[in-house]
C-alpha cells in the first residue's frame, strides 16, 4: 500500500514544530487566521520556517484573506504550500505562484466532483467536517463513505482524526495524506508529544 503522508496542523511554536518533525511528520501547518485559537504571528512563523529540515513541507492556512494579507505573509515566511479554507475561487488561489490545496467542508449534499472541477490547478483537495460558522479544526469526523473513490485530485483527509480512528480512515478513503490538529493536542494550539507519535505510528501501521 502507498505510504500515506501526515500533516500536523495548528503549529504555534518552534517546540511543537520540532515534536512533529522528530515524530516523522511530512508537513506542518501554520494558521494565519486571527479568529483561530491556533493563529500564529508572522514572526513566530518565520522562526519556524527558517529552521525547517529538508523534505518537510511548511503549509500556510488562510481563510478569506485578502491578496495583500497573503502576500505579506509570503514576503516574510517561507511556505512551500498554501491551504485555503474560505470562499476563495481558483483565480485567487492560483495567483501566488505557489502550489495550493483547497479545503472543503463536507456536507451530505456536497458535490465533491463538481468542486474538484472548479479547482483544476490545485495540488489537492482537503476534506474536512462541516460545522456552521467554523472554517476548520472542528475536531469532528464526517461520513467518509460520502467521498467518491475516483476524485481527480489527491485527497488530504481531515476532520476529527486521532490515533484511535486514523487507521480506519486510511483504509476506507485511501487518501494521499491525513491532516491532524486537535487530535494531537493537550489544548488548542499546544501539541502533545505522545499523541503525535501514536498518530503517526497508527498511520504507518496501515502499510503493513
Locate predicted features.
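Conserved N-terminal beta1-alpha1 strand-loop-helix module at the mouth
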Residues: 1-208
Amino acid at each position: 500500500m502507498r505510504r500515506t503522508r501526515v500533516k500536523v496542523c495548528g503549529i504555534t511554536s518552534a517546540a511543537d514544530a520540532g515534536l512533529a518533525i522528530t515524530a516523522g511528520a511530512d508537513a506542518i501547518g501554520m494558521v494565519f487566521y486571527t479568529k483561530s485559537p491556533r493563529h500564529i504571528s508572522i514572526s513566530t512563523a518565520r522562526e519556524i520556517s527558517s529552521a525547517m529540515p529538508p523534505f518537510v513541507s511548511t503549509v500556510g492556512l488562510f481563510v478569506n484573506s485578502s491578496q495583500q494579507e497573503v502576500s505579506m505573509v509570503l514576503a516574510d515566511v517561507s511556505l512551500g504550500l498554501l491551504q485555503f479554507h474560505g470562499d476563495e475561487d481558483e483565480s485567487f488561489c492560483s495567483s501566488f505562484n505557489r502550489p495550493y490545496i483547497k479545503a472543503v467542508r463536507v456536507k451530505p449534499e456536497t458535490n465533491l466532483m463538481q468542486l474538484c472541477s472548479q479547482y483544476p490547478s490545485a495540488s489537492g483537495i482537503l476534506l474536512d467536517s462541516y460545522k456552521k460558522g467554523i472554517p476548520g479544526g472542528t475536531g469532528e469526523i464526517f461520513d467518509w463513505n460520502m467521498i467518491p473513490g475516483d476524485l481527480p485530485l489527491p485527497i488530504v483527509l481531515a476532520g476529527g482524526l486521532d490515533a484511535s480512528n486514523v487507521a480506519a480512515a486510511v483504509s476506507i478513503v485511501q487518501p494521499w495524506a491525513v491532516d491532524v490538529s486537535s487530535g494531537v493536542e493537550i489544548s488548542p494550539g499546544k501539541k502533545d508529544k505522545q499523541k503525535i507519535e501514536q498518530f503517526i505510528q497508527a498511520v504507518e501501521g496501515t502499510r503493513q
